[in-house]
Amino acid sequence: MADEQTQDTQTPDANSAVGDELATRVQVLEEQLAAAQDQSLRVAADLQNVRRRAEQDVEKAHKFALEKFASDLLPIIDSLERGLELSNPDDENIRPMREGIELTLKMFQDTLKRYQLEAIDPVGGEPFNAEHHQAMAMQESHDLEPNSVLKVFQKGYQLNGRLLRPAMVVVSKAPAPVSPSIDEQA
């Protein structure tokens, strides 16, 4: 019987030690689980960010894949427009050729418009916009506000809102004040 009492007294201490050990083990496992779940969420978020970035890159590549090609076509459009400007619309000898150039230019412009290539062709008097215009010269003007477009040398173009070439323009400036002449000073 004495042996049974000894066993009974050892059992609560042993059970308590085993219980503490198990509680510690459970706590460690719960911490490891929380860390693994946190890491899993971070990896999932990183993966989602990588996917989104890749989709954006592909979208930009599709959107601006034509940029170089469109830039190479701009001098051709400029030449067709210049040819129309310099030809006399009343000359019967060149009328068929002029009509052919007009038709070709219109087809070019319609095709480029389908691919979101837009002309930047400021109207005289429009305020100068450094984002879309490049000032080639400044000229005094009594008729227009300072920093307005006086003349367009060359149209600009943008593709899907991105500038390919700025419009080359002459910008107005305020007239110089008239200095009094020697006769007026006397």
Curated annotation (Swiss-Prot):
The domain of life is Bacteria
InterPro entries recorded for this chain? GrpE, GrpE_coiled_coil, GrpE_head
Q: Where are the transmembrane segments?
A: none
Q: Which SUPFAM superfamilies match?
A: Coiled-coil domain of nucleotide exchange factor GrpE (SSF58014), Head domain of nucleotide exchange factor GrpE (SSF51064)
This entry's Gene Ontology molecular function terms read: adenyl-nucleotide exchange factor activity; protein homodimerization activity; protein-folding chaperone binding; unfolded protein binding
**Subcellular location(s) per record:** Cytoplasm
Pfam families on file: GrpE
* Subunit annotation: Homodimer.
Q: What is this protein called?
A: Protein GrpE
Q: Which organism is it from?
A: Pseudomonas fluorescens (strain SBW25)
